[in-house]
Amino acid sequence: LIMDNPFIGLDAVTRELLYTVLEKLAQLASLQIVLVLSMLDDIPSFITHVVPVDNKTVGEKMPRAAYLQAFREQDALRAEADAASLGELQQRIAGLPYENTNFTSDEVVRLNKVSIRYGDRTILKELDWTVMRGQKWALSGENGAGKSTLLSLVCADNPQSYACDIRLFGRKRGTGESIWEIKKHIGYVSPEMHRAYLKNLPAIEIVASGLHDSIGLYKKPRPDQMSICEWWMDIFGIGHLAQQTFLKLSSGEQRLVLLARAFVKDPELLILDEPLHGLDMT
């Protein structure tokens, strides 16, 4: 049984369920299990051996306990280096290349008694939600709770939004605005976008596509815009991947490219749906 990052995207209850199933299966002498994992905490107790893979190099096989001990010893050394890097990163972020101060409204999002149904299934029922300028929100809930559906209303990706009482950036939906007039204010990344983004362009062009909210790049960026794309790629530690084609990158590298894409236009509203999905501990 081979599973590649099986815990990604699962809520706490489902993770525990999968862990229990794998634990029971591991007791079968006739079954061998190989898990490909990015997070140290995802290594189950029933795993007997760990093979570290770093920078496309396979390390020496180690018993699980020995690997965890060695990792924690190295982690203490990494923490000091990471603290220095974090301080440098914070200084760079403080010097953003530009800052968007052209806010369209103090009321960024307002949903009034919003309900979403698919057939007989109700996803959202009479939801009220207001996001004001300067606020930072976290949506928390189990898989299937309706978080992504809620975000699709804000991102103008749900056709049912036209039948709902929704105001975005001070303007009521369905009063003549286009989807693109809404999207130009929003930076967005999600697992669904990741799966759908199949353009095999250089990574920096994927980042640049965020300037125009397009899947693919159809308008040549100005030199100053390309500089901003490079700046954000450096911030996310992927500057060296700028000319690598997107589909040849690892899933984690692709996610970092799409995160840079979400930030690149200095959006008025930044929506990150499961932003750590598929990223390693670093």
Predicted segments, located by residue:
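ABC-family P-loop ATPase nucleotide-binding domains
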Residues: 1, 191-248
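ABC ATPase NBD Q-loop/coupling interface
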Residues: 165-181
